[in-house]
Amino acid sequence: MQSFAFSTRALFLGLFAVCAGLLGFGLYLQHAVGLEPCPMCIMQRYAFVAIALTALVAGLHGPGRRGTRAYAAVILLLALAGGGVALRQTWMQLYPPEFAECGPDLEFMLGSFPLADALPMIFQGAGDCSKVDWAFLGLSIANWSLVCLTLVAVFAIMMIARKRGG
């Protein structure tokens, strides 16, 4: 019996398409539904953009085995970083701070403070980071982001462990 396997190029381009779809849905929720993203949502969005661009470059490049592992390792690190932000936001939604205040938006923080000072402020989150404005099947946007980034991390691990390149 002949086994069916997707090429590395097709898998990376498929990941790009999935991430582009997720980003498109996020933009739909922002512009059509009117949900404004909090700083943590924007950080997760950046992770998806970076994963999508890495997957696109990998798909167009069509690397061999070592290149596939290198691209997959970068994607894994990006998924873990984005997943960490999504996990923190999920925690804030489950256990909101007692006195939540809306903090400054991401642009203001990055434009007004050095990066070393802005990053801790972003990860502290704003009051609106703990608010659940939208849910599907009982999961918030942060929960869905965590699920998707976990699946991306599993994908990357499978690509690293894959026996064949190309």
UniProtKB/Swiss-Prot annotation:
Residue intervals passing through the bilayer: 12-28, 47-63, 71-87, 144-162
Disulphide linkage map: 38-41, 102-129
Cellular component aspect of the GO annotation: plasma membrane
Subcellular location: Cell inner membrane
Membrane topology: Multi-pass membrane protein
Alphabetically ordered keywords of this record: Cell inner membrane, Cell membrane, Chaperone, Disulfide bond, Electron transport, Membrane, Oxidoreductase, Redox-active center, Transmembrane, Transmembrane helix, Transport
Signal peptide feature range: none
GO biological process, one term: protein folding
Cytoplasmic-side positions: 1-11, 64-70, 163-166
Pfam families in the record: DsbB (PF02600)
Periplasmic side, ranges: 29-46, 88-143
Superkingdom in the source lineage: Bacteria
Molecular functions per Gene Ontology: electron transfer activity; protein-disulfide reductase activity
Function: Required for disulfide bond formation in some periplasmic proteins. Acts by oxidizing the DsbA protein.
Similarity section: Belongs to the DsbB family.
HAMAP family from the UniProt entry: DsbB
Protein name, entry field: Disulfide bond formation protein B
Native organism: Aromatoleum aromaticum (strain DSM 19018 / LMG 30748 / EbN1) (Azoarcus sp. (strain EbN1))
